[in-house]
Amino acid sequence: MNKYSIPANALITVAGTVGVGKSTLTAALAERLGFKTSLEKVDHNPYLEKFYHDFERWSFHLQIYFLAERFKEQKNIFLSGGGFVQDRSIYEDTGIFAKMHADQGTMNPTDYETYTSLFEAMVMTPFFPHPDVLVYLEGSLPSILSRIEERGREMEIQTERSYWEQMYRRYSNWINEFDACPVLRLNIDEYDVHDPASMDAILVEVGKVISKK
């Protein structure tokens, strides 16, 4: 246990839409706690760039890849005994991304059924530790779009604004119904990852949420 009342074996998951600052906050929180990080491997994803050029052709491949990578990370967290801050949850894969593409017809129904069946089988295994708290990052759509622009990933910048708008709406609906673990909601304009006092304040709140479990 530390000064924030966060157990040494805790799993803290950071969630939120693309560009909201999950990876940056994940690293900052892990550093303050002396925890390990579980980061999304975007740079070495063999499908991501192809997906942004052709959603219908590559949506299933991309989501299966993410699911496999996420499950390997979950198993690693389990075998390591916890003490992790995780960048993006496996729940977002199925609750946001796969469902969005199934709903808009860029993932066919058979593929979506296969995907959800595999997801459900994975979360039933003992290798699947549920987060002690999900830290949900939210903010205005203009702020998030500005961050996507500043990040400078060409495949994201070239994606139509309507795609990000739809994802933003789906995230807002998803988090209001999410109940797999306790949730702490943070506005991205109300903290500074470079300010130790700001990070301490967040971790105090994380500790309070975990203590109420």
PLM-predicted stretches and their roles:
Residues 14:
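Hydrophobic anchor at the beta1->P-loop junction of P-loop NTPases
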Residues 17:
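P-loop (Walker A) phosphate-binding loop of NTP-binding proteins
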Residues 22:
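Conserved lysine of the Walker
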Residues 31-70, 96:
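Conserved substrate/cofactor phosphate-moiety recognition/catalytic segment
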Residues 96-170:
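A glycine- and Lys/Arg-enriched "phosphate-lid" helix/loop adjacent to the NTP-binding pocket
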